[in-house]
Swiss-Prot record:
Gene Ontology terms describing biological process: protein repair; response to nitrosative stress; response to oxidative stress
Gene Ontology cellular component annotations, sorted alphabetically: cytoplasm
Protein name from the UniProt record: Iron-sulfur cluster repair protein YtfE
Keywords: Cytoplasm, Iron, Metal-binding, Stress response
Record note on quaternary structure: Homodimer.
Name of encoding gene: ytfE
Family listed: Belongs to the RIC family. YtfE subfamily.
Amino acid sequence: MAFRDQPLGELALTIPRASALFRQYDMDYCCGGKQTLARAASRKALDVAVIEAELAKLAEQPLSRDWRAAPLPEIIDHIIVRYHDRHREQLPELILQATKVERVHADKPNVPKGLTKYLTMLHQELSSHMMKEEQILFPMIKQGMGAQAGGPISVMESEHDEAGELLEVIKHITHNVTPPPEACTTWKAMYNGINEMIDDLMEHISLENNVLFPRALAGK
């Protein structure tokens, strides 16, 4: 099957572990989920045929859950428990670790200067964003009013883009979240946590942008 003309967001939802593969190639399948595989590969100067071959292997495995067919209230409940609650745990811990690493290793050339600041900004933005979803948008969708939620959904998508931009800054100052040889245990643990947080946030945004919001607007 040719995957190159399909949107990244669709591929991430229909092929097991495709999201992890896209993350490996630094391809944005959440905020940039509407771009085709061919377009995304071209922008990164990647060989689309190689990625297609890897996707073909992954596609042989069964999909654990196809959220495209799930009831909208079930998707919302899953998002809150799997992603919102998790982000609320992850970010305060990462901020504490970043504060320590920046203080203890201030004289090291590879220290991620500004990481605490940008993690704090992400935490503040996501906290406000998730609260608005849980208090305003999600209840509207659960009440069958998704088709009238174009305004709130547009705002949420814009905030997703802003979160994506912060992730790019965080990846830049951490050298794509790669610990240097001199990194201590806390430093390494923090980078592991940041990678996990980025994976979770990209999956979270993808599920909303590519499944929940379009279906809600379409009254499905």
